[in-house]
Amino acid sequence: MKGLLAKDTTLMSIIILAIILIYASFSWLCPIMIDDYMFWDKYLTANNGSILPSLSGYCNYVRDLWLYENGRLANMLCAPVVLWMPKLAWAIILAVIICAIYLSAASLVNGSRPVSPLLLMSVWICCILLLPWHDYSSLMLIDYALNYFPSTLLTLATIWAAYRIGSGRRFRNARYCLIIFVAFLTGVFHEGFSMPLLAALSVIAATRRFSMPGQW
């Protein structure tokens, strides 16, 4: 986080903690419903009605999703999260992911300058007011959260990496391998995010006549 945040670390820490506590509480208190039970049922069907962890049952679950739903990694992770992960643990993980989304978005907006408390608050408020969290898609449900929040964070990370490489700042080997892994996860996690991102990157490459750095 060095260089990312402004010098007013106390106020920034309070805002970050508030974001995490609010979303962790919201996710923890929100009951499972709708598609949570659908993927729950798919795992039970694939595992002969047993809720217990089973490699063969999970492989059957993944196979059925691949054949009859899609190859989306988020859906493949849904049953393990819903059935086996403590709800409080997932609520905390989800809250950290959401906080990282706000920090990443603020960092992209601010360029190379540190993120100030005011900017982070502004990004947070804009997301609350402008994004459709209040509609009927129930984005705080466990399976919907898996579909959208990790995908958003992975997409922002990939955009940041592409921008950094495109501006001539390359990654060293170890970090570049990590970026490749993140880009791969971005591609397989949710096609609703990865396909538009791929289209945008393709347009950028075409406008530059594909004269991009090798890492790009």
Give the predicted meaning of each segment.
Residues 196-216:
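Perimembrane helix-loop-helix junctions
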Residues 118-163, 190:
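Membrane-interface micro-motifs in multi-pass membrane enzymes
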Residues 1-22:
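Start-transfer (signal-anchor) and selected internal transmembrane alpha helices
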Residues 84-100:
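Loop-to-helix entry region of an early transmembrane alpha helix in multi-pass inner-membrane enzymes
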